[in-house]
Regions:
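Terminal helices and disordered tails flanking the catalytic cores of nucleotide-processing hydrolases
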Residues: 1-41, 48-51, 174, 203, ...
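Acidic/His-rich, divalent-metal-binding segments that scaffold phosphate/diphosphate chemistry
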Residues: 4-143, 150, 154-157
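Tryptophan-centered motif/residue detector
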Residues: 23, 66, 162-163, 248
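Alpha-helical scaffolding flanking metal-ion-dependent phosphate/phosphodiester catalytic sites
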Residues: 88, 111-123, 130, 134-234, ...
């Protein structure tokens, strides 16, 4: 899974295609891991491998990474769930750098982002292509999936308690108007992941609705004026921007 990248200052159109191919390969590898996790040999090592690959691609060129990731998300052939996981994992990695999280917290955050919906991978793909409202059974699965995902990861020999805790509570409501540094690590990471999860879901089109613009998505989460006390939304806007590379914007005229 080693990513071989062209030098940042010597990139041409053909090399962008090479980079897009690398992102596509990464997305496909993640899809395999998430689609049949119980059949993956040494699941923890595979997730770490995907994480290292992601870090290599982002380190090469962050703007190119954002552009290609968002382009891939809108044309993904592997299913919504893996595409959403990759977007969340990438944005969490970028946010961890911006927020200067300790390496252990960064690793737990990104790996939680990649696996938070692992108990409902197939259902998430179905829902993305479903025009009707979720059935009662689907609603139950949606409601219970954080705990089910945590339990599945434990079966897969994940022993990082911070990773497990964040997955298990990733839909919990965590105060976003207190300093991140004052929160416990599991609450701090849950707060970051929750914001990224909502943002990534809003910009992704589904059969039941079109994706929002990146600008509208940020404003839906943080309001028209981003409160600097909401460190996560503020950092998201500062690091990714209201109009990230590779996303569509709606013009006033």
């Amino acid at each position: 899974m080693a990513a071989r990248l062209p030098p940042g200052n010597q990139r041409h159109d053909g090399e962008y295609e090479d980079l897009l191919s690398l992102w596509s390969d990464l997305e496909s590898a993640l899809s395999v891991v998430l689609s049949a996790p119980l059949r993956v040999q040494d699941f923890p090592a595979k997730v770490r491998q995907v994480d290292r690959w992601l870090q290599d691609l982002v380190a090469h060129d962050i703007d190119a990474a954002l552009y290609l990731m968002f382009q891939l998300a809108s044309t993904s052939s592997v299913g919504y769930s893996a595409s959403h996981a990759l977007v969340c994992g990438t944005l969490c990695h970028i946010m961890a750098q911006e927020l200067q999280l300790p390496p252990r917290e960064r690793d737990s955050l990104v790996r939680a982002a990649l696996t938070m919906n692992i108990a409902m991978t197939a259902l998430q793909d179905v829902l993305a292509g479903q025009r009707e409202k979720p059935t009662a059974a689907q609603q139950d699965a949606i409601r219970n999936h954080p705990q089910e995902s945590q339990a599945l990861l434990e079966r897969l020999f994940i022993t990082d308690n911070l990773w497990l805790d964040v997955v298990g509570q990733h839909h919990a409501s965590i105060s976003d108007r207190v300093p991140l540094a004052s929160q416990e690590p599991h609450d701090r990471l849950t707060r970051i992941l929750g914001t990224i999860d909502r943002y990534a879901a809003m910009i992704s089109p589904r059969k039941s609705r079109a994706g929002r613009s990146a600008t509208d998505s940020v404003r839906a989460i943080a309001g028209h004026e981003v409160d600097q006390r909401d460190e996560v939304s503020y950092t998201l806007v500062r690091s990714v921007g209201l109009c990230p590379p590779g996303t569509f914007v709606r013009l006033d005229n």
